[in-house]
Regions:
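Class I S-adenosyl-L-methionine
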Residues: 1-35, 44, 209-216, 226, ...
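A contiguous loop/helix-start segment that scaffolds small-molecule binding in enzyme catalytic cores
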Residues: 6-8, 76-166, 304, 308
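Class I SAM-dependent methyltransferase SAM-binding "motif I" and its flanking Rossmann-like core
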Residues: 13-77, 245, 255, 299-320, ...
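Conserved SAM-binding loop of SAM-dependent methyltransferases across substrates and taxa
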Residues: 196-208
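Short beta->alpha hinge that forms the Motif I/post-I loop of the SAM-binding pocket
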Residues: 216-221, 286
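C-terminal substrate-binding/active-site "lid" region of AdoMet-derived donor-dependent transferases
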Residues: 268-332
Length: 336
């Protein structure tokens, strides 16, 4: 901005609008004032070296970002092209793959592509020991063992994948809750009373660049939430210490809000006021007191009100029977 009116040239590698400086400049300066001259990107060069179709590959960057975010992309038969931070990144990613039962995955480090010192290193995640140059792009072909962790991006991860004190939105209820929150690319969720963060984590996994803020007054539960976010590939979960509604002051307006506990009229009014147009609100109630509040709000605002009860097969002596969980009353609506 200080140089406005003069011709300024910014040199960037590859395509400046693909995980590069061009996007940041475009947010600070009107794109009408900028002329971009893209060259071959690291992704294009890497795909050509590997013989992979770009249409069938997930591209991501961990350059200057938490490397754990690639965990969410570990899927059987998935091909990944990853911009790394440096020489240690491939070893870290090999460790993530091996820990999750993907040790047979094929890794290829492509260093200094297009230059005089171009080099290639091939190996399996479980035996990766190469010392590679710092300027590299990593190609991964994910190969799952029989005991591999199956972590789909759709909501409904197994409860045992989450650290916690037992107070959490359980698997089947969580799946319906996140579905009704409608995760979308780049959208922001407030998880009010987030506990171990299971809903926020599933929301962030379900859509690329989805964001979430978890509001939780208990330090131990915030620790659980942070650990779960890291382990499940969404390390950018933001956690706020505080009580609702005061903790909501000055937060960015959300596209969706989940209230899993501690419902009150004051909490609802603060959330509803902050929710953006076309925003989604989902509230789960277990107690009679919370259910009564939901009934009153439903009568005033409409939406969808459902009761969900899950029963699971359990051994009863030598036979098997159904053991029901506590019913959950779920209210969802869209702000129009």
């Amino acid at each position: 901005r200080a140089l406005r009116g003069r011709t300024v040239v910014v040199l960037a590698t590859g395509d400046p609008l693909w995980f590069s400086i061009g996007a940041r400049i475009g947010r600070a300066i009107d794109p009408v004032e900028i002329t971009y001259h893209p060259q071959l990107s690291a992704f294009q060069l890497a795909a050509a070296r590997m013989g992979w179709s770009m249409a069938d590959v997930e591209t991501l960057t961990v350059h200057g970002r938490p490397v754990e975010q690639m965990i969410a992309f570990i899927q059987p038969n998935q091909r990944l092209l990853i911009l790394t931070t440096g020489a240690e990144t491939p070893k870290q990613i090999a460790g993530f793959l091996t820990e999750r039962g993907f040790g047979k995955s094929q890794l290829t480090v492509l260093a200094s592509m297009g230059g005089e010192n171009e080099a290639r290193f091939d190996g399996k995640a479980e035996t990766w020991q190469y010392e590679v140059p710092a300027f590299n792009t990593l190609a991964v072909e994910c190969i799952a063992a029989k005991d591999a962790a199956m972590l789909p991006r759709v909501p409904g991860l197994a409860d045992e994948l989450f650290q916690g004190d037992g107070t959490m939105t359980k698997q089947e209820i969580r799946a319906t809750s996140v579905a009704k929150l409608m995760p979308m690319r780049g959208a922001l969720l407030w998880d009010v009373g987030c506990g171990c963060g299971s809903v926020a984590v599933e929301w962030m996994r379900a859509a690329r660049y989805a964001r979430a803020i978890g509001i939780e007054p208990r330090a131990d539960r915030r620790t659980y939430a942070a650990n779960n976010a890291l382990a499940l590939g969404v390390p950018k979960l933001e956690l706020i210490d505080g009580f609702v509604p005061s903790a909501l002051n000055d937060l960015e307006s959300p596209d969706a809000i989940f209230i899993g506990g501690g419902l009150s009229i004051e909490t609802f009014e603060a959330c509803w006021s902050a929710l953006r147009p076309l925003g989604r609100l989902v509230v789960n109630a277990v107690t009679l007191e919370s259910e009564q509040i939901l009934l009153n709000l439903y009568a005033k605002y409409g939406g969808d009100l459902v009761r969900i009860q899950i029963s699971k097969a359990n051994s009863i002596g030598k036979v098997t029977g159904w053991r029901p969980s506590m019913p959950v009353t779920q209210w969802s609506l869209v702000k129009r």
